[in-house]
């Protein structure tokens, strides 16, 4: 009664003053404090003094102030009766100041105050005396302070209080006595405190409370009757606490609609756990170490719309959902489910979203009874077969995710009755074929990770397809990706990553916990006409994943064939002359012969690629997947790496052998044993085998590209392998260069011409120079890729792989044939049937006639070196007794004839 009289009195005064204000306009505007901003609302004034660095309340506030914002200042105290004349003030904001204490009477006279904000201050307890008799107060914010104590009389007289914030403080218990007087309270948050226990009848007088937040505390136990009296409670948040047991006290909350107790330590959900909560709409209890769930736990919840159970790793049985007929979204991930009951759709006729990912489901029932299903997520399970009835007549299904299963069999009509399906993910399965019936409406298709799925997919079955991921780039050729690449170049990664966002359209079906995939399939087809005619397909085709020809140009094709033919012919001649029957092979010739064999293998690997290019000419996409994933490509890649590495290693041994040989000769020392050279050769072969096999043992293969060779860019493992090879080979070339530089520097001018077999020294030097020059582009591109320098086009990389790398296979034998006099001698001996090194068998060859020497020497002189009482410096075996050599181990000559250098 008194309140009505007071309100009538204030209304009368307001009307009178309004008439006065109408006669004297602008009066109130002039009374606005200097640092503040004021706004007229009829007779009343809104004053904004926020973030003005104030240390006290501004003066000259209008008595008609209805809104006063003093937040984000430096106010440290509020004197008593400082606002006693602000009878019309309805909202007062003091947040973000330095208030540590509010005295009694600080809010005296604020009979109309409805909203009081005191958050983000330094209060250590609720200012109980200051709050007394704020009868109109409806919202009180005390959050983000340091409050650890709430006096029992804190809220006395706050009969109209509807909302109370006490979160983010230091409370250790529920302020039971202080809350007893708040019978009109509708929403309260005590979150982000240090509360350990909720006692019985903690909220017994809060019969009007609708929302209660207790999350992010340290609650480990609940009284069995702690929620008694909360007859109107609809939302209860117990998330992020330390609860060990299911909160059985909720059984008294008959009107509860939203319940959250996720991220606790609850291990079990008992039978009929929610029997007293028939109004529940949403339950969140994921991220609990749940080991057991009663089969009847979720029965008879007719209003339940969403059920989320993530991370319940010990659940092995699908819950019985009898009576929970309104469920629209069911998420049960990270459990141990092995099967689904056949009656799942009978119990859930209104189900729209089903997420059973990360389980162990092996067999799927028929979902034909779930006519409202729009999204099914079954990724990361163990499903083997999709039958024709599994998804039959799901006319509303728009997204189906079956990735990371073991699906090997899909019935041809499995998707024939899914007219609304626009997103299908079957990536990382064991598919060998893919049915296309009924998928004409697809816009997103993912088949990547099915290595056995090598057939091309006809594009005419997917007229609306916009985004696709295939096992092989060649399968993108059918969707004109090659043609697009010719005009637009390689697609930008940022554009690819945002392409899905361009198509997304949220139709607001449900608020899901994870809407990343759900929104991805909801497309707007009418936004841009240009987008309708483009297909984003990955992995994209290109020079290393060609659609038409393995070799991109006729220049490359002709060059490869020329290298192959020359390597076969020239290396065959070198091998025939070096390894002639009944002839002794010295160490340096043995190395040259082995290098020729390796060069032949390199030519063979290039010949295989050239043959594949010829056989698949103009239609490589049809056979590309079969070729690069087959054994033939693996063998070709192995041979190319093995041959290339062995050639470099043998060339390194040859360079070192020449250096040691010259050193022994010039110092009249006995040569090192031939056994050391043989051991080095064996080591080279073993090291090359290890290098060539390592891509297979490390999990990667040579089939990353149809060239069957590790790429200089792209896949990190392949690029890392190539960079390691380049570093190793560069080290070999460095060792060879140092050895030969040291060799030439140690010899006096003209001394090399007097050394036996100096032609071999010069030949190895020529090989070193040629191979080093040819290897520079490979090293440069490898390090460019490592540094992400992309100024070199993939076409150039491809040409280097096809032409530069195998080029030594034909140049090495050509250099030997054209410039080494040993070849002329050996080919003549081979032609006439003579035995190699016949001069070493005849003791009469103490000297060579001047006429013969003149024919063989470019300077018409004979190079002779006399070794007095020293062993002959040929590379004969240490214990040779074969009659084919016709000489003894320590056979001595007074003078020896030598093959000239020129």
From Swiss-Prot:
Positions of glycan attachment: 60, 74, 205, 496, 788, 797
Q: Where does the sequence pass through the membrane?
A: 559-579, 590-610, 635-655, 679-699, 719-739, 764-784, 799-819
Q: Give the main location.
A: membrane
The way this protein sits in the membrane is described as:
Multi-pass membrane protein
Residues in compartment: Extracellular: 23-558, 611-634, 700-718, 785-798
Q: Which UniProt keywords apply?
A: Cell membrane, Disulfide bond, G-protein coupled receptor, Glycoprotein, Golgi apparatus, Leucine-rich repeat, Membrane, Receptor, Repeat, Signal, Transducer, Transmembrane, Transmembrane helix
Q: Which GO terms describe its molecular function?
A: protein-hormone receptor activity; transmembrane signaling receptor activity
Residue ranges of every copy of the LRRNT domain listed in the record: 32-61
LRR repeat start and end residues = 41-61, 62-85, 86-109, 111-133, 134-157, 159-181, 182-205, 207-229, 230-253, 254-276, 278-300, 302-324, 325-347, 348-372, 374-393, 394-417, 418-441, 598-619
Q: Name one Pfam family in it.
A: LRR_6
Q: Which residues form the signal peptide?
A: 1-22
> Which Gene3D superfamilies does the UniProt record give?
Rhodopsin 7-helix transmembrane proteins (1.20.1070.10), Ribonuclease Inhibitor (3.80.10.10)
User: Between which residues do disulfide bridges form?
Assistant: 32-38, 36-49, 345-370, 476-537, 633-708
Provide the Gene Ontology terms for cellular component. Answer: plasma membrane; trans-Golgi network membrane
Q: Which residues lie on this side of the membrane: Cytoplasmic?
A: 580-589, 656-678, 740-763, 820-902
One biological process term in Gene Ontology = positive regulation of canonical Wnt signaling pathway
Q: Which family does it belong to?
A: Belongs to the G-protein coupled receptor 1 family.
Q: What is this protein called?
A: Leucine-rich repeat-containing G-protein coupled receptor 5
Q: Which organism is it from?
A: Xenopus tropicalis (Western clawed frog)
